[in-house]
Amino acid sequence: RSPDVSWVRKTRWDELRLEDQEKFAPICPDFVIELRSKSDSLSQLKSKMEKWMENGCELAWLIDPIQQKTYIYQPNVAVYEVTDFDQKLSGGTLLPGFELDLARLK
């Protein structure tokens, strides 16, 4: 399964064969976002996020507009929970300057 949003560093993307770039690429993204919908199981999405991290993802955001919570996943760090939507998420050193204003999802 693919995430709702993903990003791969250009250097890693360029290492793929052209034919792999033109289809569902066999690469784990560096960054993913999953946005929970009413039909999604939170536990299944959390499991999916863990799989991304196990496969080399560096930053993952599980955004739950239903409960207005966001779960931030990073390698070798406990999952950080943002408990309100009055904050901005930052791409940090992986995506300098990238921010997502959670208030826009209310």
Q: What is each of the regions a protein language model found here?
A:
Residues 1-55, 59-106:
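C-terminal interaction segment
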